[in-house]
Amino acid sequence: MGEPAMKKVKFYLCAVLLCIVFFASCSDGNSDGSSGSEDAKHQSTDLKDGWWNDTAFYHIWVKSFCDYDGDGCGDFNGIKSKLDYIKNDLGCDGIWLSPIFECDYKSKSPSGNMHGYDVKDYYAVNSYFGTEDDLLSLIQACHDKNIKIIFDFVPNHTGKGNAWFTNSCEGGNKKDWYVWNNSKLNWNPGMGSSDTWHKNPKGNDYYYAAFWEGQPDLNFRNYEVREEMKNVVRYWLNKGFDGLRIDAVRYLIETENSLVDTPETHAWFNELRKEVIDSYKEISPKFMVCEAWIENNRSALNAYFGSEEKTEFNMVLDFDQGRGCYNSIYESDSRILTSTLYKNPSEIKAYGTFIGNHDEYMGRIASWFGGYSAEIKLISAMSLLRPTVPFIYYGNEIGMQEGNYNGDLRLRTKLNWTNVEKQRNDDSSILSLNKALLALRKEYPSLFKNGTVKELKSSTVNTETKNPLYTVAAYTISDGKDTLLCVFSLKNVSDNKFWFDCGDLDISSYSVLIGVNNEKNLSLDGSDIKVEYIAPYETRVYYIGDDKKEMLFTDKRLFLRGDMNGWGYDEMLYDSEKRCFDLWYKLDPDSYQFKFDAYCDWTLSYGSGEENTAGKTVPLDKEMQTSTEKGENTNFLFTPLSSGTYRFTFYEDDNTFVIRQE
C-alpha cells in the first residue's frame, strides 16, 4: 500500500484569522449564508426531545412515489396528495425524503436512475420535483397532520457539476474544498470502484472519489467546508424539516491509519450535533439519523451515538436486524432471529430498523419470497415487532416486487397505486397487517420505545433425532406494565404443537391480537408453554394479562390437501372482493379425494362431515356444503371426466365450495 496522503489543511495561527474565516461569505451561488436557528419557520409544534423513538418513518423515493402533474416524475405535490394514505391507511407519522437537491444526472424516464447523491447545489431543490415553495407547502402540510419530515443529506461528496468542484478544478478559491494529490494513491475504502483517484479535467493532479468518479469527496479538513456543511443543515432545518438522515457517514475524513470511521469523522458529527442540531431544542427538537453501513460490528455502529460528553447521532440505521429477519426464515432457524434482535439503547437513542431500502442491501422483500404473501407478512411483522424505530421503504407495505431493471434501479420503480387501493379494501392484505402492527405500536408506545425483549427457549424436540427444533421463534416484549408474546413460524410446514420454556411468564389470561384466528391455542404444559395449530409462516401476537383485547388482524388462510398434491398441502389464494379462496390444478380422468384445512392441520379441516371414508362425491359446477365446524372431517371425492385445468373455489361466508373446469 502506498504512503497515504493527508487531506490538505490550512492552519490558522490566531483567533482573528479564525473569526475571519468563520464569518466569510461563500459567494458562488451554491451557498446561502443562513446561520442561526432563530430564522426557523414552518416548524413542528409541541415536539418533545426524543420524539423520534415514538415515530414510524415512511421512506419515499420521490421520483417514483406519486406523479401529481403527470410529467412522468414523482413530485412534492404528489407526496402532499398522499399524506392521508401515509398517516391513516398505513399508520406512519414520519417521512424520510430521498435526496431532493439539484443534482448532476436528471431523468424523468423510468429507466433513468436519477438518485440525487451527485449534488449540484445544496441550496436548490431538484426542479423535476417542483419548486421550493412546493416543498415548503409539503412540509407545512405534514406538520398540519402531525407528520414529521426529514431530508437526505449527502456531506461526503458532491457531483462533478457542482460549482464548488468546477472552481476547485480551476485552482480557484475552493481548490482545497476537495481532496487532491499529484499522483494516484492506493486508497480503497471498500465502496464502489477500487480506482478512487481521477485526473483533474482542467489540470494535472488527481482528485479522490470514494464512491465513483462522478462524486468527488469534499475535504472536511478544510475549515470552510466544515462550516459550510453546517450551514446547509441549518438552512433546511430552518425551512421546517424535523431532522435529517446523513448518507455515507463513515467516509468523511481519511487519516494515515484508516479511510473509514476515523476519530476526525466522529469529531465533526459531534460538532454538528452540538452546534446545529441541539441549538433547536427550545424551538422544535431536531434529530439526525446515521447511515453507517456496518454489519456484525455493534461497537463500531454504536460508536456513532458518541459518548455522554461528545454526543453524535440520535439514531443509527441498523443493518443487522433486517438481515437477521430474512436469514431466520431462509434457514428456518429461530436462533438467527433472536441473536440479531436489539432494543433501543435508551429513551433518546434509537436503532432504525428496516427490511430493504433504495440500496443493494437485500432487495425488495416481495421478490425474495416470489410474491408469496405469507412470507412477506411474516418478515414485515418481524421487523415491526421489536423495540426499535421502524422505517418502511415505499412499496414494501404492499409487497411490491422489484422492477425489470439492473442494479439498484430495480428497487426504485413506480408505486402501483391500483394495488394500494385493492389492498386498502382487503382486511387480510399485507397493507392491512402493516397498519395493524403500526397501530399496535401506537397503543403501547412505552413498550416499543424502551421495552425489554426476552427470548423463549424452544423445548420442542424432533421425535426421531431427539434434537431441538428451532422452526418456531418466540419472545416477549415487556415494559413492566404490558407484555406481548410474539410467535413466528419460520417454515412452510404446520406445527400442531410447539413447546417453549415459559420461565416466569404467567399465561393464565391472554388475548390474541394477531394471527389466523383468536381461538384458545396457548396453554401451560408442565413447566412449558404449549402453542398449538401454527400455520406455515404465521405470525401470532398475544397480549398477556387480564385485560381483554380485541383482535387487530386476522390473517385469512386456507389450504387444500388431497390426492392431487400427494396429501401435502397447497395454500389457496384469497380474493377479498369475492370473499373466496381459489386454487387451480391440472387433473386427469381419475378419482381424487381431498379436504380443506384451516391451518394446514389434519385435525382442523373442512370436510364432508360424513362417515364415508371413501369420500362424498362432488359433481362439476355444483356448489357443495362442507362441514360448518373445523375438525377431523372425512374427504370429498372428485372424478374429472376429461384432462384439463380445474379451479377449486371455497367461499368463506358459508363454507361452500365449487369445482369448475377452466
What are these language model-derived features?
Residues 451, 508, 588-590, 642-644:
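A glycine-anchored, Pro-Gly-centered beta-turn/N-cap motif
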Residues 551-591, 599-626:
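Aromatic-rich carbohydrate-binding modules that target alpha-glucans
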Residues 146, 160-161, 165-188, 273-409, ...:
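Conserved alpha/beta catalytic core and glycan-binding cleft of carbohydrate-active enzymes
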Residues 14-22:
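Bacterial N-terminal signal peptides
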